[in-house]
């Protein structure tokens, strides 16, 4: 039985992680975010009520769960306060159940200004970031000039550090990007107004999680974005700025990697991507329109329309390698209802005739690839809300089985709708 479970995306994000984390946290004591920031968008539907979380772990909707934002997350005080408000208005005691690492880098207004100025400057070569300051905040962290949650304990020292780093960034904004500088006084006043709320939630995350492990408490690590957006292993440079893969758990939370027991990879029954970058199986036809409309494929964070395409087993095999996936959760199976035939990409062929069984990493390597497809019959039956395998048509069962064969990993969970109850659990990650 696994006590410590990782839930992460195996495609380009938006796979439906939030719902699955919420479902499985019925059995967990802790839910931990370990990377990313408020560029994530985790949508939960409980008894018909929709909640979108960007920064706070999805376990916050479970009364028995402690939620932790680990050191690998870049934290925007403004975004956190904005997210806490509606939850607290619903009677959820966020400040009693949410805890922060003092090592979380802060996202401040100058990071957002830089992010947006850079995207404008890139023009047609824009990465397609959310414009929320994620990348610049991670840059500051690596450059060792970033301000962290722990710096807020000494407000005078924080003010001096802020002045220094803002002089650096405002110089870039004014003289390189021809953009307006950010007001030091306004940033300082805003952060100081939030400082006491943030510092009151600080704990020693590594110690807390290790104590929980020793007690036998069940811990869930909630990934954001997806494997193919990983800063190192994704379609570089069209990637996010953090390690979205399983290897990011230990670095982003301080939890020992040897203690991770089960890694659940979330994958849609088809593929989507937001923003620029390679997307080999993308569909610009009626099928792509069907997937986008029926799947309501609009970003939870940006509202941007998602690009849609067939399931890519080649990319999925890469995700299996990187993450050592224990089992898959296949989401949005119901979106495939009504398609006469369904295709799965099983290989990429290069210009020199070589067949690739796993996807390349750099974006340039995707140019001029020929895709190898396998066609399967679709189904007309309605799978929405199915709760047992017996309720699925044979063609859907065959599709699930073929994905298992192509990836070498079992599909342990199938999601057939947005509500936590619209789920088929073949094997529970916690072994229950």
From Swiss-Prot:
<feature type="binding site">
    <location>
        <begin position="300"/>
        <end position="306"/>
    </location>
    <ligand>
        <name>substrate</name>
    </ligand>
</feature>
<feature type="binding site">
    <location>
        <begin position="41"/>
        <end position="43"/>
    </location>
    <ligand>
        <name>GTP</name>
    </ligand>
</feature>
<keyword id="KW-0658">Purine biosynthesis</keyword>
<feature type="active site" description="Proton donor">
    <location>
        <position position="42"/>
    </location>
</feature>
<dbReference type="GO" id="GO:0046040">
    <property type="term" value="P:IMP metabolic process"/>
</dbReference>
<dbReference type="GO" id="GO:0000287">
    <property type="term" value="F:magnesium ion binding"/>
</dbReference>
<keyword id="KW-0479">Metal-binding</keyword>
<dbReference type="InterPro" id="IPR001114">
    <property type="entry name" value="Adenylosuccinate_synthetase"/>
</dbReference>
<feature type="binding site" description="in other chain">
    <location>
        <position position="304"/>
    </location>
    <ligand>
        <name>IMP</name>
    </ligand>
</feature>
<feature type="binding site" description="in other chain">
    <location>
        <position position="225"/>
    </location>
    <ligand>
        <name>IMP</name>
    </ligand>
</feature>
<dbReference type="InterPro" id="IPR033128">
    <property type="entry name" value="Adenylosuccin_syn_Lys_AS"/>
</dbReference>
<keyword id="KW-0342">GTP-binding</keyword>
<keyword id="KW-0460">Magnesium</keyword>
<feature type="binding site">
    <location>
        <begin position="415"/>
        <end position="417"/>
    </location>
    <ligand>
        <name>GTP</name>
    </ligand>
</feature>
<dbReference type="GO" id="GO:0005737">
    <property type="term" value="C:cytoplasm"/>
</dbReference>
<feature type="binding site">
    <location>
        <position position="306"/>
    </location>
    <ligand>
        <name>GTP</name>
    </ligand>
</feature>
<comment type="similarity">
    <text>Belongs to the adenylosuccinate synthetase family.</text>
</comment>
<dbReference type="InterPro" id="IPR042109">
    <property type="entry name" value="Adenylosuccinate_synth_dom1"/>
</dbReference>
<feature type="binding site">
    <location>
        <position position="144"/>
    </location>
    <ligand>
        <name>IMP</name>
    </ligand>
</feature>
<feature type="binding site" description="in other chain">
    <location>
        <position position="130"/>
    </location>
    <ligand>
        <name>IMP</name>
    </ligand>
</feature>
<dbReference type="GO" id="GO:0005525">
    <property type="term" value="F:GTP binding"/>
</dbReference>
<dbReference type="GO" id="GO:0004019">
    <property type="term" value="F:adenylosuccinate synthase activity"/>
</dbReference>
<dbReference type="InterPro" id="IPR042111">
    <property type="entry name" value="Adenylosuccinate_synth_dom3"/>
</dbReference>
<feature type="active site" description="Proton acceptor">
    <location>
        <position position="14"/>
    </location>
</feature>
<protein>
    <recommendedName>
        <fullName>Adenylosuccinate synthetase</fullName>
        <ecNumber>6.3.4.4</ecNumber>
    </recommendedName>
</protein>
<feature type="binding site">
    <location>
        <position position="41"/>
    </location>
    <ligand>
        <name>Mg(2+)</name>
    </ligand>
</feature>
<dbReference type="InterPro" id="IPR027417">
    <property type="entry name" value="P-loop_NTPase"/>
</dbReference>
<dbReference type="InterPro" id="IPR042110">
    <property type="entry name" value="Adenylosuccinate_synth_dom2"/>
</dbReference>
<comment type="subunit">
    <text>Homodimer.</text>
</comment>
<feature type="binding site" description="in other chain">
    <location>
        <position position="240"/>
    </location>
    <ligand>
        <name>IMP</name>
    </ligand>
</feature>
<dbReference type="InterPro" id="IPR018220">
    <property type="entry name" value="Adenylosuccin_syn_GTP-bd"/>
</dbReference>
<dbReference type="Pfam" id="PF00709">
    <property type="entry name" value="Adenylsucc_synt"/>
</dbReference>
<comment type="function">
    <text>Plays an important role in the de novo pathway of purine nucleotide biosynthesis. Catalyzes the first committed step in the biosynthesis of AMP from IMP.</text>
</comment>
<keyword id="KW-0963">Cytoplasm</keyword>
<dbReference type="GO" id="GO:0044208">
    <property type="term" value="P:'de novo' AMP biosynthetic process"/>
</dbReference>
<keyword id="KW-0436">Ligase</keyword>
<feature type="binding site">
    <location>
        <begin position="13"/>
        <end position="19"/>
    </location>
    <ligand>
        <name>GTP</name>
    </ligand>
</feature>
<feature type="binding site">
    <location>
        <position position="14"/>
    </location>
    <ligand>
        <name>Mg(2+)</name>
    </ligand>
</feature>
<feature type="binding site" description="in other chain">
    <location>
        <begin position="14"/>
        <end position="17"/>
    </location>
    <ligand>
        <name>IMP</name>
    </ligand>
</feature>
<comment type="pathway">
    <text>Purine metabolism; AMP biosynthesis via de novo pathway; AMP from IMP: step 1/2.</text>
</comment>
<feature type="binding site" description="in other chain">
    <location>
        <begin position="39"/>
        <end position="42"/>
    </location>
    <ligand>
        <name>IMP</name>
    </ligand>
</feature>
<keyword id="KW-0547">Nucleotide-binding</keyword>
């Amino acid at each position: 039985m696994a006590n410590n479970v990782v839930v992460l995306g195996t495609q380009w994000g938006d796979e439906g992680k939030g719902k699955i984390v919420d479902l499985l946290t019925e059995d967990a004591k802790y839910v931990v975010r370990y990377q990313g920031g408020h560029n994530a968008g985790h949508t939960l539907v409980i008894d018909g009520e929709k909640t979108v979380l960007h920064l706070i772990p999805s376990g916050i909707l479970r009364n028995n769960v402690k939620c932790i934002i680990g050191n690998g997350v870049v934290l925007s005080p403004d975004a956190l306060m904005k997210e806490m408000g509606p939850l607290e208005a619903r009677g959820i005691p966020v400040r009693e159940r949410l805890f922060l690492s003092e090592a979380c880098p802060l996202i401040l207004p100058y990071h957002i200004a830089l992010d947006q100025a850079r995207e404008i400057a890139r023009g047609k070569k824009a990465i397609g970031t959310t414009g929320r300051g994620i990348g610049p905040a991670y840059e500051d962290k690596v450059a060792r000039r970033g301000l962290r949650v722990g710096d807020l304990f000494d407000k005078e020292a924080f003010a001096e550090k802020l002045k220094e780093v803002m002089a650096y960034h405002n110089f870039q904004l004014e003289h390189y990007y021809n953009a307006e500088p950010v007001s030091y006084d306004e940033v300082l006043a805003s952060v100081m107004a939030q400082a006491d709320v943030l510092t009151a939630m600080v704990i020693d995350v590594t110690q807390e999680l290790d104590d929980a492990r020793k007690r036998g408490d069940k811990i869930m690590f909630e990934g954001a974005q997806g494997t193919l957006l990983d800063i190192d292993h994704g379609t570089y440079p069209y990637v996010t700025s953090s390690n979205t893969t399983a290897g990011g758990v230990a670095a982003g939370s301080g939890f020992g990697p040897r203690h991770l027991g089960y890694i659940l990879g979330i994958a849609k029954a088809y593929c989507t991507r937001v923003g620029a970058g390679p997307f080999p199986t993308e569909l610009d036809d009626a099928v792509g329109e069907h997937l986008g409309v029926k799947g309501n494929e609009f970003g939870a964070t940006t509202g941007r329309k998602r690009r849609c395409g067939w399931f890519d087993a080649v990319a999925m095999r890469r995700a299996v390698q990187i993450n050592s996936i224990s089992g898959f959760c296949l989401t949005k199976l119901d979106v495939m209802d009504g398609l006469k035939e369904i295709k799965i990409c099983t290989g990429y062929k290069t210009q020199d005739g070589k067949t690739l069984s796993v996807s390349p990493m750099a974006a340039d390597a995707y140019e001029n690839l020929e895709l190898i497809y396998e066609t399967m019959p679709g189904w007309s039956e309605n799978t929405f809300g199915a709760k047992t395998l017996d309720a699925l048509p044979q063609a859907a069962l065959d599709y699930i089985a073929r994905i298992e064969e192509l990836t070498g990993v079992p599909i342990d969970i199938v999601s057939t709708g947005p509500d936590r109850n619209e789920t088929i659990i073949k094997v529970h990650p916690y072994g229950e």
